[in-house]
């Protein structure tokens, strides 16, 4: 059967179910609600970002794709959740943000240092200095989309500063 005939349920972990009493949802909270999710007739669970992040954009500003953010649990919690989903015949879809990273991601940090490293073209740089902004676009965070603390001073677009 095609995914077109399936029920997809999106979970934003931060607000779904808190398992440890800190007031924020987490992966273990999702695991505790698997029976409820299954009862809804769900086939696929689409989980919003939970990777390590400075949380300036609610997890969409990933700083490490290999680690679950401590806010949501651990890599072991993710493995257990996936096992429980499989046991319940549920499929997991991970909202993997690959169009951009946090300014705290090692790739970005290296890319902004110099034009001569392997990450130099992994981000869009304007080629102009900080006094010649490409346009006046604002981000949803209210700041210019391309401000840069970088020695390169030519970033064309990035997430807001986590400072």
Report each predicted region and the residues it spans:
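Conserved small/polar residues in nucleotide/adenosyl-binding loops
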Residues: 146-153
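Conserved, mostly hydrophobic/aromatic
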Residues: 11, 37, 47, 65, ...
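Structural preference for beta-strand elements that scaffold enzyme active sites
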Residues: 6-10, 44, 91-93
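Hydrophobic or amphipathic alpha-helical targeting/insertion segments
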Residues: 84-101
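Hydrophobic alpha-helical segments, chiefly the membrane-spanning helices
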Residues: 157-163
């Amino acid at each position: 059967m095609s995914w077109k005939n399936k029920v997809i349920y999106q979970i934003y972990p931060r607000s779904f179910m808190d398992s440890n009493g800190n007031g924020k949802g987490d992966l273990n909270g999702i695991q505790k609600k698997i029976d409820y999710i299954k009862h809804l007739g769900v086939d696929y669970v689409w989980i919003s970002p939970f990777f390590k992040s400075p949380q300036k954009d609610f997890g969409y500003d990933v700083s490490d794709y290999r680690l679950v953010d401590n806010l949501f649990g651990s890599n072991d919690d993710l493995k257990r959740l996936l096992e429980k989903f499989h046991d319940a015949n549920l499929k997991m879809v991970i909202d993997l943000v690959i169009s951009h990273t946090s300014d705290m991601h090692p790739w970005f940090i290296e890319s902004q240092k110099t034009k001569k490293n392997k990450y130099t073209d992994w981000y869009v740089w304007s080629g102009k200095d900080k006094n010649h902004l490409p346009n006046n676009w604002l981000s949803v965070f209210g700041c210019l989309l391309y401000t840069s603390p970088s020695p390169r001073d030519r970033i064309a677009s990035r997430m807001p500063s986590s400072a």
